[in-house]
Amino acid sequence: MLKFIQNNREITALIAILALFGLLGVIDRQYFSLQTVTLIFSSAQILILLAMGATLVMLTRNIDVSVGSITGLCAVIMGMSLNAGFSLPVSCLFTLLLGMCAGLFNGVLVTWLKIPAIVATLGTLGLYRGFMLLLTDGKWIEGLPDELKSLSAPLWLNISPIGWLLMILVLAMAWILAKTAFGRGFYATGDNLQGARQLGVRTNSIRIIAFSVNGVMAALAGIVFASQIGFIPNQTGNGLEMKAIAACVLGGISLLGGTGSVIGAILGAFFLTQINSGLVLLKLPAWWNDFIAGFVLLAVLVFDGRLRCAIEKNIRQQKYARFLKNDKNNQVT
């Protein structure tokens, strides 16, 4: 049973989602509807994008705590570009390039300058947040065009254009990680860095790509934020990094690297967003969100650690039992 949970974290995350649906459905019968699912999916899009980027970084046994600041900075650049008269496609391109450059800078700090990821990204967290406030002078960006807001308007099956694009990105990343040698390079890099190098995996390139894609995903999250909210506060992106990491860990991405899948991370992001919807249903204050996200992260880490210890203990017991059995057979003969 323990080994099943460890090897099938996506299934356990899905079971948790269904169980929470059942619990909230008992409280409010109207919760059981397709509209509820699409609303949660719409609310989860920002966190899903951040979880996708964090998946690549965590698979390589690194961590990036600057994604919230990158999201805020990219949202600001998006809003300023549009208000300056640039078209929507050009503004999106500027934003994505900025996100990629921010992620690339993180990757260079970690890979080439050998700075621990947590230290490097803590530094860039403040750097990007400060740059964002310098650009806006601490003010909000308002008056965004309706063209941007239309990206998050419901389309077919009550899902927005961004929602459909997101599903395509999820499927593409899942296929790349599971079915290609390039994708397996992320797992190899996080599982055994030296061993991966001996097998010919370009580990430095893999890690830089992971951070760069993470930056692009944060930029996409900034675009989604601007389109959904319609304005950009000066605190955009605050605290999102913790929720992204919590979603990944909840979905089975190991902090030790080399384990997990993007599907699990997506399910973790959906579950955390579902908890937020439950708080609304229960009429609890919004500041419970961060508390619950932190509690879930801590609980999953404790559970994951205990689960690993239990599995390792069980493996040792089986190994010793086999040796003892062989010794008894030798004594009999």
From Swiss-Prot:
**Spans traversing the lipid bilayer:** 14-34, 39-59, 70-90, 93-113, 115-135, 157-177, 213-233, 252-272, 284-304
* Compartments reported by the entry: Cell inner membrane
Major localization listed first in the record, in broad terms: membrane
Q: Name one Pfam family in it.
A: BPD_transp_2
Single GO molecular function: transmembrane transporter activity
A cellular component term, taken from the record's GO annotations: plasma membrane
Q: Its membrane topology, per UniProt?
A: Multi-pass membrane protein
Say yes or no: keyword Transmembrane present: yes
Against InterPro entries, the record matches this protein to: ABC_transp_permease (IPR001851)
Is Nucleotide-binding one of the keywords? no
Keywords assigned: Cell inner membrane, Cell membrane, Membrane, Transmembrane, Transmembrane helix, Transport
Report the function annotation for this chain: Part of the ABC transporter complex LsrABCD involved in autoinducer 2 (AI-2) import. Probably responsible for the translocation of the substrate across the membrane.
Family the entry assigns: Belongs to the binding-protein-dependent transport system permease family. AraH/RbsC subfamily.
Whom does it interact with, and what assembly results?
The complex is composed of two ATP-binding proteins (LsrA), two transmembrane proteins (LsrC and LsrD) and a solute-binding protein (LsrB).
- Protein name (Swiss-Prot/TrEMBL): Autoinducer 2 import system permease protein LsrC
Organism in which the protein naturally occurs: Photorhabdus temperata
